[in-house]
Curated annotation (Swiss-Prot):
Biological function: Acts as a chaperone during the assembly of the 26S proteasome, specifically of the base subcomplex of the 19S regulatory complex (RC).
Protein name as catalogued: Probable 26S proteasome regulatory subunit p27
Gene that this polypeptide is encoded by: nas2
Main location per the UniProt record: cytoplasm
GO CC term, one of those recorded: cytosol
Length: 213
């Protein structure tokens, strides 16, 4: 596990540095794609162009390093857990489930959709947890604007497909913030969309009227 700890430490250091660089972009109110030149081809005078360029370059480099570290960490963990028996893994899963928090809180203190969107647009570090592969006509999902192919990133503070059914059942007729990916730009960055979803009974089955996988 020493190797894992070293890799995890490096990963956290990179994430801290990315947050600092993200602050530079947030301060200048720009993203990774905001034009830095005027229509005449001159550097814009309303922003700190040199600082932004430096931050962007370092962000790109660190994002690549971060992905490589995640791959290395995954391989290390696979080696560690490969020695466990199925029985011990099952026991670990049960322990983990028992230690998890109570049903997700609708007003979680650490949840802030605007902050998530701002940070995600700048660094593009969003990871969807499921994909919409069908939407029924006149369903709550269609009312909210969900489309086939949408990749869900957050439903309020839920980021796990296994937790979503219980959360939806506990929040019937409540308006939930949804952050999703709807396609990708030419440079590979995500197109983020924010929707309002209200689970409720309708003429079809379920509370959403869509299928997720």
């Amino acid at each position: 596990m020493d190797e894992f700890k070293q890799l995890d430490l490096k990963k956290r250091e990179i994430e801290n540095r990315l947050n600092e660089l993200e602050g530079v972009l947030l301060k200048e109110r720009v993203t990774m794609d905001t034009p830095l030149l005027t229509e005449d081809g001159f550097p814009r005078s309303d922003i700190d162009v040199p600082s932004i360029r430096t931050a962007r370059h370092e962000i790109i480099t660190l994002r690549n390093d971060h992905r490589e570290l995640e791959d290395q960490i995954k391989k290390v963990l696979e080696k560690v857990f490969s020695g466990f028996s199925k029985e011990s893994l099952a026991a670990n899963d049960e322990t983990k489930l028992a230690q998890e928090a109570d049903p997700l809180n609708f007003n979680a203190a650490n949840y802030n959709m605007n902050d998530i969107i701002s940070r995600s647009k700048i660094l593009g570090r969003v990871k969807p947890f499921c994909v919409v592969d069908s939407v029924a006509v006149e369903s709550p999902a269609q009312e909210a604007g969900l489309c086939i192919g949408d990749e869900l990133v957050h439903v309020q503070n839920v980021t796990s497909l296994s937790e979503l059914p219980t959360f939806i059942s506990n929040n019937v007729n409540k308006t939930l913030d949804v952050l999703l990916i709807r396609g990708y730009s030419a440079d590979g960055s995500t197109n983020l969309v924010e929707l309002k979803l209200t689970p409720h009974k309708w003429q079809g089955p379920g509370l959403l009227g869509c299928h997720l996988r």
